[in-house]
């Protein structure tokens, strides 16, 4: 009888410990995703009087950044300013706008409101089309989609 009681107690303790430990499972860590600014101060960048700003945050060690720079500079016009903020020479701007991934390309209006942004590689067609849409006041057909 005593053996049965000891076995029952050990069994109850084992089941209790199992339930307690199974509740303490470690959740997978949440990965922060890179974010883009929604507002910028146009005075921080060249030609603040133009209607639009195409702003590329880049790094000299990034091959994709060089491609984005080439695609951005051709957008400059009478109403569109283009500014390239390379990390080593504009580190303070990367910190101010919390740029944590490059290339980041933003299209902002005269008040500094960011209407469209690209994180990572983007085609020239997509960048041109995005600028045309925001200048014409058209909604982004891909807004809210995950890619």
Which residue ranges define each predicted feature?
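Soluble, non-transmembrane catalytic domains of enzymes that act on hydrophobic metabolites at membranes
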Residues: 100, 105-106, 125-129
């Amino acid at each position: 009888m005593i053996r049965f009681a000891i076995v029952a107690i050990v069994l109850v303790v084992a089941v209790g410990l199992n339930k307690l430990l199974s509740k303490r499972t470690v959740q997978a860590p949440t990965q922060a995703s890179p974010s883009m600014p929604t507002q910028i101060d146009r005075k921080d960048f060249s030609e603040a009087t133009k209607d639009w700003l195409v702003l590329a945050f880049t790094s000299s060690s990034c091959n994709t950044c060089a491609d984005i720079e080439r695609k951005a500079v051709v957008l400059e016009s009478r109403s569109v300013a283009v500014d390239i903020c390379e990390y080593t020479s504009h580190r303070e701007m990367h910190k101010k706008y919390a740029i944590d991934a490059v290339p980041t390309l933003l299209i902002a209006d005269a008040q500094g409101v960011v209407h469209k942004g690209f994180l990572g590689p983007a085609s020239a067609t997509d960048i041109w089309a995005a600028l045309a849409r925001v200048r014409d006041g058209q909604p982004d057909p891909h807004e809210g989609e995950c890619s």
